[in-house]
């Protein structure tokens, strides 16, 4: 991962700009391939088997969508950014992969793609009132989505997020155990590889969204603050 990060950092940013749409198209083809030859696992069809490893195209699309939107707005006059006709292409670029990801189904990644795209549109200069209209439309559509679009497990995730205690041994198990791990880390943590929640299988999926709880248990509040500081440095450096 670190080697790949360094290689990407060494590539001239103009190369990413030139090939942004090509990368997006490749990611889109991979998402379509999931529909045709995708591997099913844990009740979802999200991966493509490449022999040596399985690739999750939605992860590639997270990067490809950012590049494509950045490329589009790079060539858009600033005074034209907020006009409706200049929003058609970005909306299509966003909604097509989101729809494909929702079919897998992968609600979390779909929401992340939407959130990332929204941030880019804001930074590009799209007026806030347009987002207010969009947000109002989404709120109005929530009952319809809940009734007709969301799968049972997706509804469980939403309800569990709002109240993990409703099913502490089922859907809420990971959240409950992650809270225990966060609290047990204390100020300085239990030490590297010494976390009981993470290494005694109380958090069986600790390598996924719950990786932060593993860090908190082993390195405590100080370790968490150190991680936050690194993120802040990256953001500050990006704006500098």
Where are these regions (language model features)?
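Hydrophobic alpha-helical transmembrane segments of multi-pass inner membrane proteins, especially
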Residues: 1-174, 213-240
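Long extracytoplasmic/lumenal interhelical loops at the membrane interface
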Residues: 186-222
């Amino acid at each position: 991962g670190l080697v790949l990060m360094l290689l990407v950092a060494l590539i001239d940013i103009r190369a990413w700009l030139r090939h942004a749409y090509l990368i997006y198209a490749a990611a889109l083809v991979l998402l379509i391939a999931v529909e045709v030859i995708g591997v099913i696992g844990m009740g979802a069809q999200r991966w493509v088997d490449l022999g040596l490893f399985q690739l999750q195209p939605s992860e590639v699309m997270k990067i490809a969508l950012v590049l494509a939107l950045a490329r589009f707005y790079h060539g858009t006059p600033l005074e034209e950014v907020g006009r409706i006709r200049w929003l058609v292409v970005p909306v299509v670029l966003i909604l097509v992969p989101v729809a494909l990801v929702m079919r897998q189904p992968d609600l979390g990644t779909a929401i992340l793609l939407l959130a990332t795209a929204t941030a880019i549109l804001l930074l590009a200069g799209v007026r806030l009132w347009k987002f207010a209209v969009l947000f109002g439309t989404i709120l109005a559509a929530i009952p319809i989505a809940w009734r007709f679009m969301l799968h049972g497990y997706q509804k469980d995730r939403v309800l569990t997020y709002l109240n993990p205690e409703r099913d502490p041994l089922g859907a809420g198990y990971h959240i409950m155990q992650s809270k225990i791990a966060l609290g047990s880390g204390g100020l300085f943590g239990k030490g590297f590889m010494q976390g009981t929640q993470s290494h005694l299988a109380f958090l069986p999926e600790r390598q996924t969204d719950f990786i932060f709880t593993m860090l908190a248990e082993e390195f405590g509040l100080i370790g968490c603050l150190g991680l936050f500081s690194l993120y802040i440095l990256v953001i500050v450096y990006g704006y500098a």
